[in-house]
Curated annotation (Swiss-Prot):
SMART domains: DUF1943 (SM01169), DUF1944 (SM01170), LPD_N (SM00638), VWD (SM00216). Precursor of the egg-yolk proteins that are sources of nutrients during early development of oviparous organisms. Phosvitin is believed to be of importance in sequestering calcium, iron and other cations for the developing embryo. Residues 948-972, 1080-1329, 1351-1432 are annotated as: Disordered. Residues 1397-1409 have a biased composition (Basic residues). Phosvitin, an egg yolk storage protein, is one of the most highly phosphorylated (10%) proteins in nature. The lineage of its organism: Eukaryota, Metazoa, Chordata, Craniata, Vertebrata. Produced by the liver, secreted into the blood and then sequestered by receptor mediated endocytosis into growing oocytes, where it is generally cleaved, giving rise to the respective yolk components. Residues 1092-1124, 1150-1235, 1273-1299, 1357-1381 have a biased composition (Low complexity). Keywords: Allergen, Disulfide bond, Glycoprotein, Phosphoprotein, Signal, Storage protein. GO terms for biological process: cellular response to estrogen stimulus; response to estradiol. Pfam families: Vit_b-sht_shell, Vit_open_b-sht, Vitellogenin_N, VWD. This is Vitellogenin-1. The gene is VTG1. Induction: By steroids (estrogen).
């Protein structure tokens, strides 16, 4: 045992002599082979990469203790730019020479125990070269511990002090130590990096915890040979990887920069190293030192030799290339010029300025790009120009704005910026001063965000704020506070507190705007010191004495700091006790909005907000829009790690619907940071009053003594602070306020003066008009570097890796404008006279924009660049060349536009990703390789599989398939990676050949998503989008395009083509021969079908079964249309029977032409007009007819199935006439042939239907029909054709029967229609919903809508025929405005019956049991009273009201273009509007839009095509009832519509559920009609509605949707039926209702009164004293209304209305009438005079009620009937009134506000406070106010006390005795009994106004008194 221990001890002692620490012995030279490689690119194979490789030999010599010399020689450099990994490095001789020149001089470094110390090098060694040395020495940095094999430490390196983990393995036999160390370059105490351009963004810590956009790690492997004396590194390998992704690092895709190093020992020689005889300076440590990369832009590389000459050349080139047009490379050229300006000095600037400053185009570019250079030299140059006054104020403002926001806050820049602000910002509050200070504050913000001190710039603003406060200069105070908000430093809090209410003695006296700005200034400070800001804002919010608006803004700032749950619960508790609904509603809506956020940094807060909302919902969930609210929309995509949030909040004042302040803010989450790109705030107050009253100074107060005399009689009356009319706004970008402005009353009045006043008083207007007459030619360009974001980190090789984003743009506006004004303006010309002048305006303008966005990742130095570059370019060019003639008096506008003669690109967007290498010594060899190339795809992906037996035909099939794949746009579908190499190309053109132009959109895309379907790979590649105008060439050229608009009486004179509609009767003769041929073919087919009927039975049955299984809905409108075209005999025979009786109605229903016509006849005639144009295009061949019949028969099964639901009702009708049998769809039978016959009859009927099919149509049915058509037998087709022929003949013969049969038929049709329509509409709510689930749906979902039009009409029997016609249409719920309403009704019946729900039959049966009276009334209005009876073409009876002609003027003078004419006919109960668009050429294409507005109903249609018959969309809006509540329904239906509309609507429908969910709608899936949209709204309360929206496939509903105005709901649910509503006042009534929402009414009667805020009180009024009912409570009152009883016994009152222009008294006379005096003159005294008006005051009588209107004074009206007084004030008086009627602010807690702004403790005390006392009792009022002593001595704080009232109490005058008393509650202030003052001293004391209330007690107050003798 002892021997073992001894051996261990000896071994341990021996090992202590071993040296693991690498070292370099003195007088030894260690030679290594060194290789470093850098790669930049995408990690996937097959894509392009760039790289750099450097090979060399490195000699390290020991030249002293702990001092070594390193020398690099034999350098060989190579570049890589090609497909990875197949390409290879290519040697670069010039790069080798450049590196050899930089690394030829050796350097010294300290080295001890594996640690590199200071580096010493001559000054001739560049920073870039020294960094390469650092890359090699970084390998030598080792921290080895002998006794540990695995450990982690913080180790210094080239990238900083980072977390490093070691793993050591020892091979004792070979005396080798294997060392592996790994560095986490994201976990560094002192990380070496430079980040610029992101100072205005905030890091999202939660986002960075979830996802790292940038990761970097390095792994080192060493082999160390050790002996007892030394250890030598024999081999070292380093691999460092930098990974970057803009999206999620796992699912988003990555770009990498990979660095590798190899160091291998060759030999060790004992020799003395040769040290160069140069002076070595300490040049820092191992950590990387930034050098040329800070000045070198990564987007280009070029040599700078003669910078001044190069600036001149680049500037001249930029001006010349952008003079005519703006090329796409203009931003790149501007960026190169800016790079040169950064490299230049002040002498260069001065030389260039002298040469070009006098030339406007050059001067503009210099003033744009010099500030963007963002150096202290450019700032100094600009400051000198300001000192010499060589720049205008506008030029100074824009240069300072750009320069200070673009500059980095170095010490030199801060010094120059401080001088500019102190010396050159004017003292006046001009725009320039605001820009200077706000921009300097933003620069100070960046300085404070850096490690450097910012105390100097902070001191500038603190002193400025103190001086502004001392001078009470409000504008300067606002500017100082906004500047402190931009700085956002916690040191400014104590200075901001001076302006906050509750923190400084005089702060409460400052204007409200100052308080608002001070609170908002804390917002940016809260980002740095959230705890301090939370404490301040929470205290402000909890202080109810502070204005509600300030408290709400404090809450906004508080929630921006993301407080925790405890603070939020304090907030919730305060809101539950909050007296102000404005504040409570605002906080609740804000918390609810935040609770829905999905952003990572708000998840904790969102959870807490949801808890808070649960506590607040029961109380505040139904608050209306009259209260302040916050609206917020946000989304965050996890796979992109990006999000967007938009917040909008409104602050209302006094419950007005018009907000006082509105703020909109946009927030983004990207790259792990949060930014607020834009924030806009607008505030306005008093504008309503100013616009109503006009401009009038506040002189009314001085000239009317009555107000002052009256107000003296109130106790301690205090006026409300008057808000001067103003409008203000501000703009913030990235949290920094750029500009703010404020328009006061005088400014707004000056703006109005510009319009209404003569221009001789405003010289600028006169100069502008003169310039326009002579012609103005201007060219303006603006070059901007909008964004420069850079992140630079070192790599282990010594080269810097940069990730950067550049966004530059050049904008150009050029134009010439000349105006000819007739008659020529005189010297006293006003702008309003332009309305009576003729103006000819000739303008040629162009707007061009070129934008260039570049993203770079890779290596960037001034010697070499290698990396990935993604370039996105946007080019837009909008030319405008118009000659316009405007004749306002004649209501005529004429414009001429030149034709399109060459292709013009409007916008081009392109994006491409390159692998780029550039070498400063060999710029010609620069290489930009697209990252994605076709040859980059591996060969195996290009190969196709060829079978041994494959033939040429299969090759052709494969080729065709590949072409189809590319053309279909699926070339990059996942799972077909080989197609990814082929570009996706799509081109779409909209051809307007009429005007010789077409608009084309071309898209091209090829990306790398076929390799990996992630966002980054979708972006990599090449994408292009181009929108252009192309000429359409024709035989005759177009000279110009002319647009003429003529309104008024001269509109018909501008018509080029007379609008007429072709009568189908005129087409009959031309098509008669065609019809005979078709009839003969059908007869032949009929005979064949009869012979084969039995054999075709089975086939027809199987086909119908197949059709049923392959279609989801019973019918298709597309198939209906084809059936109508393929069965011409239907039109033939029906036309032959009624052609002579028919009259053509292009805008109406032909069925209404005669009341004696039968329903079937009308239906047939109607179908003629709708299908005539289509029938003419039918094929003559029998195969065509057979095919059409065959396609229509595929619906046989669905027809049979639908007919079963109406079997009982249709069987009786089928016996009477075949027409009604067709409408009933026949009765199903057991045989297939009869079933097919019923189907064909339904198909025939549907072919006549051109209206709106319902959900029974399947979109995919057409393809099924086409497939089935190929397999059907000819015998089956013949059978169907024969049956069709027979049914048609039967229908025709039936329609020519006697009138009695026709009458019965019409009656049956009418009843059947009523049943089906009612069944259809009643069943929509529950369609496709099982019975057991119906009960779980909301009630509103199941309610029936009942139109109110029938009820309205029943009370208006004497109205016009058009009104009665609409009654019938409204009650049937059919869109009878169609030109073929009969066929529509039949189709609606079919659609209704086709739904196989038993509820339909039940509801139809229920509707058939209506009262006989109802049916009789319906039938009474049926004949000749359709809604569309008078909707014939209005152009036949009235001229057009407006004509618009767009004409292409041809050289042969032929008409080409379009003409639109509008017709309007209106009366008291109906408005009929029609718009017809026709081609100027003689074609039958037309577009028709018509609308009818009736009481309680409006209807509109849009139709276009041949004679307006091909396509149609119709809408019907109706008022009615749902569950006996007022309801409105909007129904939109459509027939055949173009495919692009279908595709667009289908695409939009995908977003409907998501949008509905965000808006709060609930969803229920239903098979709603496929061609119908219904919106229903039912008023559930005066403030809320229930809404149901039915769209195809889904039903949405919302219960309790709040509306921003009170709905006019009467006591009876049908009150609207008797109101005198006309077509003209229906919509204005709704607008008036919204406008009147802000008007308030107060009512005062005997002992009751109801305030403006609808609070009712009952308390005693004084018997003989006047009491203030309502008054304007501002500093300068505009009205005061008082009232008092005439005598003690009477209930009658007298009213005094005092305004600033008149005193009006209304008092009762002996005969119970009312006497009115105005300014002591009797008015309305004569029996014949019922109205008096003077000085904007109107007085009139309505029966016994006197009404006074003074809107200019704020009084909408005052109604008084002798007992009840009603006062209605204008909307702009909200929150500005006082008196018994309250303050009119919609707040319930402050109704009992006394004149001194204290809340009364009781109603009686409140009323008594507004009593007007008199000095003597001769006037009848015998009361006075006295302070009283409490008749007991309460114990306060343990002491017996004497108490005196804080407010006076009404008592009788001296020598008067009270007759009647009442009890009032009064507050008392108490003194200790021993030291109490007397009552007399208390009355004289001034302390009582601010004394606290210790107790509240009830005391007696006198109401009425009796007096003896003189009283006082």
């Amino acid at each position: 045992m002892r021997g073992l221990i001894s051996a261990l001890v000896l071994t341990l002692v021996g090992s202590q002599h071993l040296n693991y620490q690498p070292d370099f012995g003195e007088n030894k030279v260690y030679t290594y082979n060194y290789e470093s490689i850098l790669f930049s690119g995408i990690p996937e194979k097959g894509l392009a990469r760039t790289g750099i490789r450097i090979r060399s030999e490195v000699e390290i010599s020991g030249i002293g203790p702990k001092l070594c010399l390193i020398r690099i020689h034999s350098i060989e450099a190579a570049e890589y730019n090609g497909i990875w990994p197949t390409s290879s490095f290519s040697r670069s001789l010039k790069l080798t020479q450049a590196l050899t020149g930089q690394l030829s001089i050796p350097i010294k470094f300290e080295y001890s125990n594996g640690h590199v110390g200071n580096l010493m090098a001559p000054d001739s060694v560049s920073d870039d070269g020294l960094n390469i040395y650092r890359g090699i020495l970084n390998i030598l940095e080792l921290s080895l511990k002998k006794m540990q094999h695995s450990y982690s430490i913080q180790e210094a390196g080239i990238g900083g002090i980072c977390n490093t983990t070691y793993a050591i393995q020892e091979n004792k036999k070979a005396n080798l130590v294997d060392v592996t160390k790994s560095k986490d370059l994201n976990s560094c105490e002192e990380k070496v990096q430079v980040v610029t351009g992101s100072a205005y963004t905030q890091p999202c810590q939660t986002c960075q915890q979830r996802n790292k956009n940038s990761r970097a790690t390095a792994t080192y492997n060493y082999k160390i040979k050790y002996t007892h004396n030394e250890a030598v590194i024999t081999q070292a390998e380093v691999e460092e990887v930098h990974q970057f992704t803009p999206f999620h690092e796992i699912t988003g895709g990555n770009a990498i920069v990979e660095a590798r190093q190899k160091l291998a020992l060759i030999e060790v020689q004992k020799q003395v190293a040769e040290v160069p005889p140069k002076e070595f300076q300490k040049r820092g440590s191992l950590q990387y030192q930034f050098g040329s990369e800070l000045l070198q832009l990564p987007v280009h590389l070029f040599k700078i030799k003669d910078v001044e000459r190069q600036i001149e050349e680049r500037l001249q080139d930029l001006v010349e290339t952008t003079y005519e047009q703006l090329p796409s490379d203009a931003p790149a050229k501007a960026l190169k010029l800016m790079h040169l300006l950064r490299a230049a000095n002040e002498e260069n600037y001065e030389s260039v300025w002298k040469q070009f400053s006098s030339r406007p185009a050059y001067r503009r570019y210099l003033l744009d790009l010099l500030p963007a250079a963002a150096s202290h030299r450019s700032l100094r140059f600009l400051r000198h120009k300001m000192e010499r006054q060589e720049l205008t104020n506008w030029e100074i403002a824009q240069t300072v704005l750009v320069a200070l926001h673009s500059s980095s806050p170095t010490q030199e820049v801060m010094e120059e910026a401080t001088l500019i602000v102190k010396k050159h910002c004017p003292r006046s509050s001009s725009v320039l001063r605001k820009v200077c200070l706000l921009s300097y504050a933003s620069l100070c913000h960046k300085r404070c965000s850096s490690p450097y001190s910012c105390s100097e710039c902070l001191q500038v603003f603190h002193v400025f704020a103190g001086e502004a406060l001392g001078k009470s200069n409000i504008e300067e105070v606002l500017l100082a506070l906004k500047a402190l908000g931009n700085v956002g430093h916690p040191a400014s809090i104590k200075h901001i507190k001076k302006f906050l209410p509750g923190y400084a003695a005089g702060a409460s006296e400052l204007p409200l705007k100052v308080h608002e700005t001070a609170v908002m200034a804390l917002k940016s400070i809260g980002m740095r010191d959230p705890q301090m800001v939370q404490a301040i804002t929470l205290e402000i919010f909890l202080n109810h004495k502070i204005h509600p608006r300030i408290r709400m803004l404090a809450a906004v700032v508080l929630l921006e700091t993301k407080p925790g749950l405890p603070i939020l619960m304090i907030l919730v508790d305060a809101v539950l006790k909050e007296p102000s609904m404005q504040v409570a509603s605002f906080i609740y809506s804000h918390l609810r909005a935040l609770g829905r956020s999905t952003a990572p940094d708000l998840q904790m807060m969102a959870s807490a907000c949801r808890m808070a909302v649960r506590a607040l919902s029961p109380k505040f969930d139904r608050s209306g829009y009259q209260f302040s609210k916050v609206f917020r929309f946000s989304m965050f995509k996890e796979f992109l790690m990006s999000g967007l949030a938009a917040k909008y909040f409104v602050l209302n004042n006094a419950g007005s619907l018009i907000p006082t302040m509105a703020v909109s803010q946009l927030r983004t989450h990207f790259l792990g940071r949060v930014a607020d790109p834009i924030e806009v705030g607008i505030a306005a107050e008093g504008l309503q009053e100013m616009f109503v009253r006009g401009y009038s100074p506040d002189k009314d107060w001085e000239t009317n003594y009555d107000f002052r005399e009256i107000l003296k009689k109130l106790s301690d009356w205090k006026a409300l602070p008057r808000d001067k009319p103003f409008a203000s706004g501000y703009l913030k970008m990235f949290g920094q306020e750029l500009l703010f402005g404020r328009l006061d009353k005088d400014t707004l009045q000056n703006v109005l003066q510009v319009w209404y006043g003569p221009d001789e008083k405003i010289p600028s207007i006169r100069r502008l008009i003169s310039s326009l007459q002579t012609g103005i030619g201007r060219q303006w360009t603006k070059a901007l570097l909008l964004s420069e974001i850079r992140c630079i980190v070192p790599t282990c090789v010594g080269f810097p890796m940069e990730t950067s984003f550049y966004y530059s743009s050049v904008t150009k506006v050029a134009g010439n404008v000349q105006a000819q004004i007739t008659p020529s303006p005189r010297s006293d010309f006003r702008l309003t006279e332009l309305l009576n002048s003729n103006v000819r305006l000739r303008s040629k303008m162009s707007l061009s924009m070129a934008k260039h966005m570049t993203f770079v990742i890779g290596i960037n130095t001034n010697m070499i660049q290698a990396g990935l570059e993604a370039h996105t370019k946007v080019n837009a060019h909008v030319p405008v060349n118009v000659v316009a003639t405007i004749q306002m008096k004649e209501k005529s506008i004429k414009a001429e536009i030149p034709p399109c003669k060459e292709e013009t690109n409007l916008i081009i967007v392109s994006s491409k990703t390159f692998a780029v290498t550039r070498n400063i010594e060999d710029l010609a060899a620069s290489k930009m390789t697209p990252v994605l190339l076709p040859e980059a795809v591996p060969d195996i992906m290009k190969m196709s599989f060829d079978s041994d037996s494959a033939s040429g035909e299969t090759d052709n099939i494969r080729d065709r398939q590949s072409v189809e794949d590319v053309s279909s746009g699926n070339s990059f579908s996942f799972g077909h990676p080989s197609s990814g190499k082929e570009p996706f190309i799509q081109s779409m053109c909209s051809n307007a050949s009429t005007f010789g132009v077409q608009v084309c959109i071309e898209k091209k895309s090829v990306h790398a998503a076929f390799i990996r379907n992630v966002p980054l790979y979708n972006a990599i590649g090449e994408h292009a989008l181009r929108m252009s105008f192309k000429p359409v060439y024709s035989d005759v050229p177009i000279e110009k395009i002319q647009v003429t608009i003529q309104a008024g009486d001269q509109a018909p004179t501008k018509m080029v083509r007379l609008v007429t509609f072709e009568d189908p009767e005129r087409q009959e003769s031309s098509r008669k021969e065609v019809m005979k041929r078709v009839k003969k073919i059908l007869d032949d087919t009929d005979n064949q079908a009869t012979r084969n009927s039995r054999s075709s039975s089975s086939s027809a049955s199987s086909i119908s079964e197949s059709s049923e299984s392959t279609t989801s809905t019973p019918s298709s409108s597309d198939s209906d249309n084809r059936a109508s075209q393929g069965d011409p005999q239907i039109n033939l025979k029906s036309r032959q029977s009624k052609a002579n009786e028919k009259k053509f109605y292009p805008f109406g229903d032909s069925s209404s032409s005669g009341s004696s016509s039968s329903s079937s006849s009308s239906s047939s005639s109607s179908s003629d007009s709708s299908s005539s144009s289509r029938s003419s295009s039918s094929s003559d061949s029998s195969s065509s007819s057979s095919s059409s019949s065959s396609s229509s028969s595929s619906k046989s099964k669905s027809s049979s199935r639908s007919s079963k639901s109406n079997r009982s009702s249709s069987s009786s009708n089928s016996k009477d006439s075949s027409s009604s049998s067709s409408k009933s769809n026949s009765k199903g039978s057991s045989s297939s042939s009869s079933k097919a016959s019923g189907t064909r009859q339904k198909a025939k009927k549907q072919s006549k239907t051109t209206s709106f099919p319902h959900a029974s149509a399947a979109e995919g049915e057409r393809s099924v029909h086409e497939q089935k058509q190929e397999t059907q037998s000819s015998s089956s087709s013949s059978s169907r054709a024969s049956s069709n022929s027979r049914s048609t003949s039967s229908s025709t013969s039936s329609s020519s029967e006697s009138s009695g049969v026709s009458h019965r038929q019409w009656k049956q049709d009418r009843e059947a229609e009523t049943k089906r329509v009612k069944s259809q509409f009643n069943s929509h709510s529950s369609y496709d919903i099982p019975n057991e689930w119906e009960t779980y749906l909301p009630k509103v979902y199941r309610l029936r809508f009942r139109s109110a039009h029938t009820h309205w009409h029943s009370g208006h029997r004497t109205s016009s025929s058009s009104s009665s016609s609409s009654s019938e249409s409204g009650s049937s719920h059919s869109n009878s405005s169609s030109s073929d309403s009969s066929s529509r009704r039949s189709h609606m019946s079919d659609s209704s019956s086709s739904s196989s729900s038993h509820r339909h039959g039940e509801k139809a049966a229920h509707s058939s049991r209506r009262s006989p009276t109802s049916r009789a009334a319906s039938a009474h209005h049926r004949p000749g009273s359709s809604l569309t009876r008078e909707r014939n073409f209005l152009g036949d009876v009235i001229p057009p009201g407006i004509t618009i002609v767009a004409q292409a003027v041809r050289s042969d003078n032929r008409n080409q273009g379009y003409q639109a004419t509008a017709y309007v006919r209106s009366d008291a109960a109906k408005v009929d509007v029609q718009l017809v668009v026709v081609q100027l050429a003689e074609t039958n294409w037309k577009a028709c839009a018509d609308a009818v507005i009736l009481p309680l109903k409006a209807q509109a249609r849009m139709r276009w095509g041949k004679e307006c018959r091909d396509y149609r969309i119709a809408a019907l809006a109706t008022t009615g009832q749902m569950a006996r509540k007022l309801a409105v329904q909007l129904k939109v239906q459509w027939g055949i519509i173009p495919s692009w509309i279908k595709k667009t609507s289908t695409a939009l429908m995908r977003y409907v559920p998501g949008v509905a969910l965000v808006l709060g709608f609930s969803e229920a899936h239903q098979r709603n009609p496929s061609r119908e949209l219904i919106v229903r709204a039912v008023a559930t309360s005066p403030r809320s509605i229930d809404t149901v929206i039915k769209v195809p496939g889904v039903t949405l509903y919302y219960q309790g949707l709040r509306v921003p105005f009170t709905l006019a709901l009467g006591a009876s649910s049908s009150s609207y039926e008797t109101r005198d509503i006309t077509a003209w006042n229906f919509l204005p009534e709704i607008a008036s209702q919204i406008a009147q929402e802000d008007q308030s009414t107060c009512e005062v009667s005997k002992g009751d009164f109801k305030t403006f805020d609808r609070m009712s009180f009952t308390c005693s009024f004084n018997k003989s004293c006047n009491v203030v009912v309502a008054q304007d409570c501002t500093e300068h009152p505009k009205f005061i209304i008082t009232t008092r009883k005439v005598d003690h016994q009477s209930l009658s009152r007298e009213v005094h209305i005092n305004t600033s222009s008149a005193n009006i008294t209304i008092c009762p006379a002996a005969d119970s009438s009312l006497l009115v005096t105005c300014n002591k003159e009797s008015v309305l005294s004569d029996s014949g005079v019922s109205e008096y008006e003077k000085d904007n005051i109107k007085i009139y009588k309505n029966g016994k009620t006197v009404i006074v209107e003074a809107p200019i004074h704020g009084l909408k009206n005052v109604n008084f009937d002798g007992e009840i007084l009603k006062v209605t004030v204008a909307s702009w008086m909200r929150g500005k009134t006082c008196g018994v009627c309250g303050n009119n602010d919609r707040e319930k807690h402050n109704e009992l506000l006394m004149p001194n702004h204290k809340l009364a403790h009781s109603c009686s005390a409140f009323v008594h406070s507004w009593v007007l006392l008199e000095e003597t009792c001769s006037g009848g009022c015998k009361l006075q106010r006295r302070y009283v002593k409490l008749n007991r001595n309460p114990t306060i704080d343990g002491e017996e006390s004497t108490c005196y009232s804080v407010d006076p109490v009404l008592k009788c005058m001296k020598d008067c005795t009270p007759i009647e008393k009442t009890s009032v509650k009064v507050g008392f202030h108490c003194f200790p009994k021993a030291t109490a003052v007397s009552l007399l001293e208390w009355q004289r004391s001034s302390d009582k106004k601010s004394a606290s209330e210790d107790v509240v007690e009830s005391v007696d107050a006198d109401i009425d008194c009796t007096c003896t003798g003189d009283c006082s």
